[in-house]
Amino acid sequence: MLKYISYSEKRKIKLRGIKMSADTPLMQQYKKIKEEYQNEILMFRLGDFYEMFFEDAKIASKELGLTLTKRNREKGQDVPLAGVPYHSVASYIAKLVEKGYSVAICDQVEDPKSATGIVKREVTRVITPGTIIDVDFLDKNNNNYIACIKINTTENIVAIAYTDITTGEFSVFEIKGKNFFEKALAEMNKIQASEILLDEKTYSEYIEILKEKISFLGVKFTEVPNVRKAESYLTSYFDIMSIEVFSLKSKDLAISTSANLLHYIDELQKGNELPFSKIEYKNIDNIMELNISTQNNLNLVPKRNEEAKGTLLGVLDNCVTSVGSRELKKIIKNPFLDIEKIKQRQFYVDYFYNDVLLRENIREYLKDIYDVERIAGKIIYGTENGKDLLSLKESIRKSLETYKVLKEHQEIKDILDIDVKILLDIYNKIELIINIEAPFSVREGGIIKDGYNSELDKLRKISKLGKDFILEIEQRERERTGIKGLKIKYNKVFGYFIEVTKANEHLVPEDYIRKQTLVNSERYIVPDLKEYEEKVITAKSKIEALEYELFKQLTSEIKGHIDSLYKLANRIANLDIVSNFAHIATKNSYVKPEIGDGDILEIKGGRHPIVESLIPSGTYVKNDIILDDKNNLIILTGPNMSGKSTYMKQVALNIIMAHIGSYVAADCAKIPIVDKIFTRVGASDDLLTGQSTFMLEMTEVASILNNATNKSFIVLDEIGRGTSTYDGISIATAITEYIHNNIGAKTIFATHYHELTELEKELERAINFRVEVKEDGKNVVFLREIVKGGADKSYGIEVARLSGVPKEVLNRSNKILKKLETRKNLIENKIKAEQMILFGNGFEEENEEEETEILSENESKVLELLKNMDLNSLSPLESLLKLNELKKILIGGTDE
């Protein structure tokens, strides 16, 4: 196992080398706190700044582009220093966390004015990639998950718990039995967590595999201790009698994993309230199984921090709410196996598909609904502001209007099952209390409406009169002194003061008291100005404190109904998805599939939804497929680049679309329940694990053969091309026979081995199809139509021509090909001759002489190389390089 040394471990050594006794009280306080947070960058509040010292300062300077300065030298040692303003700290935290650092926020927890000695400071929260609560720095259409994984190798069980702490979602599930960890990897690939917690007993060999397989996501791995008495911890936290409430009875590993995750988050939040009201146990047996290869090969959703274009999500996501987009991403990765759930969603989609006016009206209402789910999270964390409550009010208003419209449609009115009375009460309270122009800050007043609180109104009147009187003083002093440019200004240091330019200094009366001299002006005060200043500032301070108190009273009341807000968010997401599916179906000419428990997979006029979206409208070539109890295994032949892979993937994608309740990209479709989809497509070495193309291919094929059932759908593309031709044919044949005879899964097997087409005669349910090719003189046109029968040519040279290979190379390739074909005929004749030797006609010797005359020494060398080369498996670039190598040999070079 590799030994990972973090930057924090290196800093730990440096920190120990600095003696605390030589420090100021402030630095002693810093170091004492830092000792507890050596794995984090410590942001230390000093006045209006968060400061970082020592190694933290150097890292912050490098990662954030901050100026690195030095604090006072102590015993000949400089203290590196970097700081950021407190009011903009969130953006700096987000940048550090995005780069994989954890940040500890150390705040002043007492008023500096009332402090005796040094101000008391404490770490108020720790922020890691998976525990960001500032939603302004998160992608609104993606969840930010943190996950925890535990493994029991004795019983072959893995448990995974995960949560998005900005939305309150908290789920857990267990995977048991054969290939448990492979399935766990697939689920982790779906979750795409930004941080993964590993318990201290997790087996290293599994963790290394986990890191290798999902390292491309840029995940932060964190080791955490196991929570003792995990079940008691959870029942205590959620204030429940039994864990059975969450369907977790006897699921010890799921309980322990959930406790580890919850405890970690709770510790980082330093006792702040969390948004979790329940743990949802997820039964993944009710979800279609999609392994990592299938998820990636089919381009279902983008990887973390990548755009959705070119994925199924990119095609299907025209949702108009953030909650809808986030939920859609989840359901694409987790297609239903429950036919009732599929048909229920289909019913809603169908209703909106047929009622265009209703659909467009609903989508217009939804456009004005904000991210209720994350606003609810902000209310729980206490980070909400006046703007958030106004957004919530508007969202409730639009939701209630939508509810009213849907109530007129009896068949679908239950889709927006919300707590109307509670939501209306929240709306009315926000409308009564919150100023429509409320600022973002909750500490500076201006949030609460006039007329709501009599004491607040009184203070505002005092403040206004005081400010009016100050304006009167300004006008009076201008007239008394004759200084037209005299101004009364305010700052936090001096309060209110009179400012006079140097040019008018000689006009200043004797009763003015000088407070400050500037380059171009002087600042003064007068007794009655200070008298009213005290009234204004006192009133302002009281106003801000009272407004904050009233604001928090309101949000506390709303917090008591937080479950109703989460319920609203969930219903809005589902409504958005089904109306979106109807919108997409209309826009892209999709059809409602017939889905059921039968065994027939039939798609007429099928298209690849992703490819179709990337090419000009109407240019995609449609194709059919039918797989049933008579023919459930297609052997698909045809040239490279002719559309075999696209055809196979479009079938898989349409199956998935049907299982999430969407319409499909076809003219009509009948799709059975498919429990698992497997795809083995493409050839590339796995650089992370050091596996060759062939080894990787065989590993994935083995997994398919061990896990597929007769309810599965399998896509195999060019199996066996990573080894020699005869080995490849043998393996491909055996795999095809095994799937046909032992598994019975619906399968499309694309191959360049034309020998496999003979299996149609041997395997009862196998059938040959090919990609149609039209030969027009010397040119070849790939029609991209799938027709019955096997292909008899590879058209490899034509593919090379389309790839831009130089004409000289193509011409030479044709000559070589003709010679090879001649040789093939000669060899076939030789075999016949060997059969005739018994009759003594000397045919064998004659053929050998003819072969010798046809091929020179260099040509024989080329022939030998070609015999061992799998031309159909080469990419265009590889073909070009190989052809160039052969050319050098033919003109007298070498193959060195």
UniProtKB/Swiss-Prot annotation:
GO terms for cellular component: cytosol. The keyword ATP-binding applies. This is DNA mismatch repair protein MutS. SMART domains: MUTSac (SM00534), MUTSd (SM00533). One of its GO terms (biological process) is mismatch repair. ATP binds at residues 638-645. SUPFAM superfamilies: DNA repair protein MutS, domain I (SSF55271), DNA repair protein MutS, domain II (SSF53150), DNA repair protein MutS, domain III (SSF48334), P-loop containing nucleoside triphosphate hydrolases (SSF52540). Disulfide bonds: none annotated. The keyword DNA repair applies. This protein is involved in the repair of mismatches in DNA. It is possible that it carries out the mismatch recognition step. This protein has a weak ATPase activity. Keywords: ATP-binding, DNA damage, DNA repair, DNA-binding, Nucleotide-binding. It comes from the Bacteria. Belongs to the DNA mismatch repair MutS family. HAMAP family: MutS. One of its GO terms (molecular function) is mismatched DNA binding.
